[in-house]
């Protein structure tokens, strides 16, 4: 049965005992409202580690001034039930006051990796992500931590953070989990109307178009961006906010493609902003 831990002190006590006994810890940090994408990461951890910890913590530092922290969905009982079904050992669900007992004396600034794509639209967001992930890594001390490739920019930033701060954890990127028709699974999908849900499948289809262009030898980013944009404009009613090609994981905008790339999409429907991406090319 999955155990619910609600304080930093108790979590640290469990971790210290686990480390003394040589137990491996897998960790999946989340903000709750869990879906199959999260559960895929939990299953991967359970199959690899002695203990799997899932954190459920809505982090106030990654919400901007126009983003409603209080309105973010919270469903800890349901989340606990879901992760129990796939074998998680611990859900770590601390209070905000326990993670941030006072004003932070040191600000973490991500830098250029956060100045593009989602980070450019949400200033300070990735600073908040890195701050809380640093804290959670120090509390849970995982051997392996699992992040979804759906948030590819976040994954690249966390990998850089681990390298720069010498965290003794291996980051495992998990492929995007999709519905049967290709739509990337997301807690935001419930906000789509029936018509928007039918249209939303074209995000993934447009990425497959981009992949086909690349495989056919196209290396001009503008050509790929234009073709993807044209496809989306003819298939969806939502507002296209972004079609971009960046190197990965360096996140440098590409004009002529020479290596591994990350093609990113963002579309705003009436009540949901959806993102999707594909990573193409050899590592």
Curated annotation (Swiss-Prot):
InterPro entries: Pantoate_ligase (IPR003721), Pantoate_ligase_C (IPR042176), Rossmann-like_a/b/a_fold (IPR014729)
GO cellular component, one term: cytosol
Binding of ATP, residues: 31-38, 148-151, 177, 185-188
GO process annotations (BP): pantothenate biosynthetic process
GO terms of molecular function: ATP binding; pantoate-beta-alanine ligase activity
Active site, renumbered: 38
Pfam families: Pantoate_ligase
Primary location: cytoplasm
Catalytic activity: (R)-pantoate + beta-alanine + ATP = (R)-pantothenate + AMP + diphosphate + H(+)
Residues given in the record as beta-alanine binding sites: 62
Keyword match Plastid: no
Binding, (R)-pantoate: 62, 154
Family note: Belongs to the pantothenate synthetase family.
Annotated function: Catalyzes the condensation of pantoate with beta-alanine in an ATP-dependent reaction via a pantoyl-adenylate intermediate.
Complexes and interactors: Homodimer.
Protein name as catalogued: Pantothenate synthetase
Organism in which the protein naturally occurs: Staphylococcus aureus (strain JH9)
Underlying gene: panC
